[in-house]
Design a protein with these regions (language model features):
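Surface-exposed, charged secondary-structure patches
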Residues: 100-145
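Sec-dependent signal peptide cleavage junction
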Residues: 18-28
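Bacterial N-terminal signal peptides that target proteins for export
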Residues: 1-7
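Bacterial N-terminal signal peptides
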Residues: 9-17
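Short beta-strand edge/turn micro-motifs at domain boundaries
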Residues: 148-178
Length: 178
């Protein structure tokens, strides 16, 4: 590889790895939620209800679980896009399902999900508004896996023509634990 190609690859790596704080919501300051954020939070709860129903409304055949609202990839995408962006619903499907050739439909993959926020969590939330108008809600969970631990659960919602949709979910360990 020539020196020019090495330089190009190095520059691309720097651009991909070094991002501004706006691209890293965890670096931006948070504020306690106010009633002004409640409409976006209420929509977030509706989106999480879509996720919950996708997982809980299922057929069981032997020890296999099949989503009722997602026999095919297209049907599952359409269902999940009631509460999630197109790209994130695709990521959810990759994480939650696999195609079962024997039954000709999507199968749920057993595993751990993510925390589900409820209306009672509203007063425990913090938020920030991103440059594009999306809202990041954060709830901290403590003492989950071991004494003294702390995790940030962040849900980013954006407003689209069909309402507020979940764009991303992250669960990361707080950097200042131990």
């Amino acid at each position: 590889m020539s020196a020019g190609k090495y330089l190009l690859v190095a520059m691309l790596m720097i651009l991909l790895l070094v991002q501004p704080a706006g691209a890293c919501p965890e670096l931006m300051p948070l504020e306690p939620v106010t009633e002004e954020q409640y409409p976006a939070f209420a929509a977030l709860l509706q989106s999480l209800a879509v996720y919950e129903s996708f997982l809980s409304e299922r057929d069981q055949i032997d020890d296999l679980l099949f989503p009722v609202n997602g026999h095919s990839v297209g049907q599952a995408q359409s269902y999940l896009q009631q509460g999630f962006t197109c790209s994130f619903s695709n990521n959810l499907l990759l994480y939650l399902t696999r195609w079962n050739n024997d039954y000709g439909r999507l199968q749920l993959i057993p595993g751990e999900g993510f925390p589900i926020l409820a209306a009672a969590d509203f007063n425990d939330l913090y938020y920030r508004i991103l440059d594009d108008g999306a809202v990041v809600f954060q709830r901290d969970y403590r003492e989950c896996y071991r004494s003294g631990d702390c995790y940030h659960f962040q849900v980013t919602v954006g407003e689209y023509s069909n309402g507020w949709l979940i764009q991303s979910l992250t669960l990361v360990e707080c950097p200042d634990t131990y």
